[in-house]
Amino acid sequence: LPNATMIRSLIDLLRNLQSEEDCRLFLENIRWHGVPVCPHCGSKSEEHYKLTNGGVFRGLYKCKDCRERFTVTVGTMFEGSHIPLQKWFIAIYVFLAHKKGISSTQLHKDIAVTQKTAWFMLSRIRYSIRYNADIDFGDITQVDETYIGGKNKNRNAGKRLKNTRGRSLKLKAPVMGLLSDGKVYVEPIPKASKWILHGVINSLVPKGTTVVTDGWYGYKGLSENYVHKVVDHHRGEYVKGGYHTNSIEGFWSQLKRGIIGVYHLVTRKHLELYCDEFAYRYNTRNLTDGERFSQFLSIAKKRLRYRMLIL
């Protein structure tokens, strides 16, 4: 049976997962580890009934307990999709392996689907990532905020906006990031106010731990619940007493380069999905491309419907 150790590169994927049957067996191995699990009632058994069509078994089971029918794709991002699993696997592999991602205009050429289909596939992948973000914030958490968007000077003269300097929200969307033990959590926020910044930190970071920020006024008062270390960049401070925000600022560089270089433009509506995409790659940077691919398949349990995406 095809298994995770066989996929170490895109060539391995194409060589070992040539048919829909190969892909189905691989996904069953990743998700079920050899024993089918009913997604309806959770029953795990080798005695689930295998249903055939014309005498051929194609992965359709009937639960011996709840009697519901299921396949390995039910309850996953692949459920209800008419796109062959091999195309899905190729899309997922290159999406995760490329440090800055891949655009829908490129993907649709690579796997021979329409650009609209490629865009929806990438959105489904990001959506699945979004609902599997699980980070434990340790003893020290770096916190910072940044702004995602274009520059006013690059707009056509007739479309330039007034009063867009500094932290103006007319052109750019504020994004907040928290990094601890090498893992980053990213969340778009309405504005970088004290009330919002404190709210996010209080909801995620255990009280009494150390929080490191820059000198932005929105972080004032954190010392009431945390050991608050401030590295004031305006005073030329970048490392203070061993504390810094260099790691989260390095992540911002990756995020911005990826959006500008590959996607060019991201709307505020979908910004959260793109932030989660880059956070997932960052958080799994110590895995090989094959390991990251297999890990993603094991957690890809959220299905995004098209109407949810465009509303």
Where are these regions (language model features)?
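Residue-level recognition of single "structural anchor" positions
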Residues: 1-311
